[in-house]
Amino acid sequence: MCDTQGIPLSLTVSPGHHSDSRYFSTVLDKVCLPPSLGRPIKRCRTVLADKGYDSKALRQYCDRFRIKPIIPLRQMHRRPKKGLPRLFDRPAYCKRNAIERLFSWLKEHRQIATRFEKLTSSFEVMIPLACIRICLRKSFSDRT
């Protein structure tokens, strides 16, 4: 998970044969946003995700913690539900490319892209190191 600038907020390494949506709540629970004053913020206000995360359970999880899910609906055969349909905020969804940029920045590191580290514990250490490098590059960039 990352913010709109592509700064990583939390991550979880999962097996390749598992769906990413299975770890949605785990990743959200690890988020700790630095505040301007006071305690750290434990929940974000909105979550941008692709169609793979469109499920009733994930939307209920977001509703429970007052998180606005911006997730496009899957194009599958659904029966119309009673009440107002969920609105989809397309302009806000356009900001979802931040996570794709983060993945491309992570894959610039050869050890992560080619998975040199065979043990999961070693691989889990390499990703935060790459994230630190990304944050430092964004913070101390000589470009404006």
Regions found by a protein language model. Give the residues of each.
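Short, acidic, Ser/Thr-enriched surface-loop or helix-capping motifs
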Residues: 3
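Helix-centered, glycine/charged polyanion-binding patches within enzymatic domains
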Residues: 17, 36-119
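Catalytic-loop motifs flanking and including active-site residues across diverse enzymes
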Residues: 20-23, 98, 125-128
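Charged phosphate-binding loop/patch that engages nucleotide di/tri-phosphates or the phosphate backbone
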Residues: 126-144
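Active-site beta-loop-alpha junctions of metal-dependent nucleic acid enzymes
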Residues: 12-37
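Generic alpha-helical structural context detector
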Residues: 26-29, 104, 127-131
